Amino acid sequence: MKIIVTGYKGQLGTEILKQLREGRSEIGPIPEKLLNATVIAVDLPDLDISNYKMVDEFIRRNRPDVIINCAAYTNVDGCEVNHDAAFKANALGPRNLAQAAEKTGARLVHVSTDYVFSGRENGGVAQDEATIPGPISAYGSTKLMGEKYVEQFCHRHFIVRTAWLYSYYGKNFVKTIVNAGKKFGKLEVVNDQCGNPTNAVDLAHEILQLCVTHEYGLYHCTGEGICSWYDFASEIIRLSGVDAAVAPCTSEEYKAKHPESADRPKWSALDNRMLRCTVGNDVRDWRDALACFFAHWDGDNGMKD
């Protein structure tokens, strides 16, 4: 089997390559079909997924069985001021990959986000794959357009929405909170935006379980359990052992101090219903996955040996 991983330098791409290389994750083994897979990892500048001709030629030349698209413009605030760049990476890129995958018969795994939802229809119920999206930010809008292109142009697709991703590698909320706690000793974090923290280990594991099947469609894949950013930050500080206080604030209070920030959904909790009903949901409770992260994290070096 031949697999192409786009955007391999990011959090998820790095973790997927690690699991393919080692044949397993913290959760369990990867599918047997992937143990001797040929893996082609590509990122900018070698492949710009927003360039149709470049994508078409690259996919036709390599003829993969599976394409896992981890490439995206994920800076939520940056998307508000760089609309064209966000559209090219988050919408045109997936369109180009979908068309190339359809031509060559490849399966396409496309990673999306909880930010396709408005978060306004609360009720305390996690949103499953049947919930109608309604993005309130440029990031969410461009990611939703990418989903639609994948659905339209490639019938062998897996669209996998995730949320609040962190990993041993790259920049993420966990590392930001740890570093800010060390630097300032006191943090204010919003307590009225709720979702599902997701360890990249869990997401990569589930993607690799899915990609060898024919269970095509839309999936949610996030850490089990729901919390606010304040709850998440408090648990990060507790597990890290950093001597810092975490205080709650509202979204409105945060926005007043950071008027340039994009609107974010107040309720974007996802339900992994499709995973449970198809290949099985091995995703850990967010607290357990976070504790495991701190047990293995080696600071700037990534993961402990």
Predicted region positions:
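N-terminal Rossmann NAD(P)H-binding glycine-rich loop of SDR-like oxidoreductase domains
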Residues: M1-E26
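Mid/C-terminal beta-alpha module of Rossmann-like enzyme folds, strongest
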Residues: E15, E206, T213-E260, N301-M303
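NAD(P)H-binding glycine-rich loop region in Rossmannoid oxidoreductase-like domains
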Residues: I49-A89, A100
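Catalytic helix-loop patch of NAD(P)-dependent Rossmann-fold dehydrogenases
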Residues: K88, L92-N96, K103, R107, ...
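NAD(P)-dependent short-chain dehydrogenase/reductase
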Residues: K148-G195, A200-D202, L208
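Glycine-rich Rossmann NAD(P)(H)-binding loop
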Residues: V189-C194, Y219-I226, T278
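Amphipathic terminal alpha-helices
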Residues: D285-D305
